[in-house]
């Protein structure tokens, strides 16, 4: 497996959930679906609690990205970051406002030494709360700059958009995390074109294989990258695996 070499460890917990150990020792979760996530190893369901979390970034409000946010809010001391609509809903459930950072696309915040810029995505964002479908703002991604300047772009659930070229031009992310599963997000061909626009060194595919309908594969992503002439190292993690 390739190595990143940027004092950062990225672990895939399955589906769209990632754990990042930053150069400064901060523990970061991107999206909060662990307990009901069929791809998440039992070890990680315990580790996110026993080791604690400093920050949780939420990309949007679908159950497979926020189902465990209230439990993790109660069981860790993490600061929770997301679009204002999502953090307002979390506050309505009793989570203290001083643990919530709500902002919006184009905005940048600094949390636990990490500079986070919220980016555009194109998807949808609702949550079923006690049988009622609740709007959760709009879908988003994040450009995350670690304490040492290492820059990660998590696209969130999305199709390919030309905004990705702007993100590449402005922020020059070295590593991109992006979905390849098809049906609910872009497929491997669109993901390869997204990487052509962004021009990172590394890519980690996600949001595939959890359910049969999410049929894109890392090998298909590599094939499409070759077809588009994209020079990128695709890091094919299995759920529970890490890369540093």
From Swiss-Prot:
<keyword id="KW-0378">Hydrolase</keyword>
<dbReference type="Pfam" id="PF12706">
    <property type="entry name" value="Lactamase_B_2"/>
</dbReference>
<dbReference type="InterPro" id="IPR050114">
    <property type="entry name" value="UPF0173_UPF0282_UlaG_hydrolase"/>
</dbReference>
<dbReference type="InterPro" id="IPR036866">
    <property type="entry name" value="RibonucZ/Hydroxyglut_hydro"/>
</dbReference>
<comment type="similarity">
    <text>Belongs to the UPF0173 family.</text>
</comment>
<dbReference type="InterPro" id="IPR022877">
    <property type="entry name" value="UPF0173"/>
</dbReference>
<dbReference type="GO" id="GO:0016787">
    <property type="term" value="F:hydrolase activity"/>
</dbReference>
<protein>
    <recommendedName>
        <fullName>UPF0173 metal-dependent hydrolase RoseRS_3945</fullName>
    </recommendedName>
</protein>
<dbReference type="InterPro" id="IPR001279">
    <property type="entry name" value="Metallo-B-lactamas"/>
</dbReference>
